[in-house]
Amino acid sequence: MRKSGRRLLALALLWPVLLVPSQAPARELLAVGAPFERVFEYQESGEYGGLGAELLRLMAARTGNTVRFRMVPWARAQAMLVQGQADILIGPYKTPERIASMGFSDKPFYQDQMVFYTRQDASFGWDGDYAVLKNRRVVLLNGWAYGAEWERVRPGLQVSVANNVENGLKMLVHNHVDVFVSNRRNTDPVIARLGYGRQVKPLPKVIEVQNGYFAFPRSPTFDKLRLQFDQELNNLIETGELKKLGKRYDVSVP
């Protein structure tokens, strides 16, 4: 009876443990990205900030993980994810090519307006007809996605590539190009920092609205992590927490 009682006691103590779902072991995740204004930034304190960084810290903590960050040029950040050298990419827009090589979060966490920037004294205007760009020099950013319609008309244009927003703006100001294509979130703060407010202007008509996501390596081994982060992001959306964070960082959220 004593042995039987001990067995029953041991089973009673073990029973709650058996009912708890197994948790994936904690991991230190590497999140990579390029400097994206108010989404992913390197701060003077030496910490990484922005809406994307804060969301990843929250979601990592709530899934029992930790996260560290690395900032590299955008084309390199994408390559690191695709090659399995990083666990999360911060902020990509969806394109058919990226969907084929990356696993995107179920929902976006921010939204951008893509526009044309010109010099203040330029007579160029845009009403949606891409034909007006045919004889104008255009600069794009390396590795950025501008939408399906833009990709359709791009082959017939005079296109240069810049590695960052600052270089693109300088090319415009110094008359190396006529039009700079970018988004307002990334570009307007740089215009202010460089003192270009009286030299360049965004055209009022929006080219396209793009949604920004988190992306993971397209591998079955990352499916569970992606689904966990999807659940946490959905919770942040449903509770209104994402909306509050968007206001704090001055980032548009869907």
How does the language model describe each region?
Residues 28-42, 126-144:
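Short loop->beta-strand "edge-of-pocket" segments that line small-molecule binding or catalytic clefts
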Residues 34-36, 111-115, 192-230, 252-254:
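Periplasmic-binding protein-like
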